[in-house]
Amino acid sequence: MEKILILLLVALSVAYAAPGPRGIIINLENGELCMNSAQCKSNCCQHSSALGLARCTSMASENSECSVKTLYGIYYKCPCERGLTCEGDKTIVGSITNTNFGICHDAGRSKQ
């Protein structure tokens, strides 16, 4: 009987020691601090100012402000959700200064 109890305790301790799906460095949830968009489940690491802390945030929805792309992996405005396009500044200056903002539009709907 003692051996069964010990085996059960060992099995429970192994089960609790196994890491969960939540990330520490990658696979971060929205609202968690990040240093690059590749760390976030949503693929968007956003900060509100140059000195602000960046956090994982959802991608921009239709008619929301967006960034075309970033050279640094951190956005002031997140890129659009899948199926939407960000119509805005696509110049190299906008990419370097991270001010290439636009609005998310459904490309299929705007052609009709």
From Swiss-Prot:
It comes from the Eukaryota. InterPro entries: CLPS_chr, Colipase, Colipase_C, Colipase_CS, Colipase_N. Residues 1-17 form the signal peptide. GO terms for molecular function: enzyme activator activity; lipase binding. Its main location: secreted. CDD domains: CLPS (cd23011). The keyword Signal applies. The keyword Disulfide bond applies. Residues 18-22 form a propeptide. Disulfide bonds join C34-C45, C40-C56, C44-C78, C66-C86, C80-C104. Keywords: Diabetes mellitus, Digestion, Disulfide bond, Lipid degradation, Lipid metabolism, Secreted, Signal. GO terms for cellular component: extracellular region. It is found in: Secreted. GO terms for biological process: digestion; lipid catabolic process; lipid metabolic process; response to bacterium; response to food; retinoid metabolic process. Belongs to the colipase family. Colipase is a cofactor of pancreatic lipase. It allows the lipase to anchor itself to the lipid-water interface. Without colipase the enzyme is washed off by bile salts, which have an inhibitory effect on the lipase. Enterostatin has a biological activity as a satiety signal. This is Colipase. It comes from Homo sapiens (Human). The gene is CLPS.
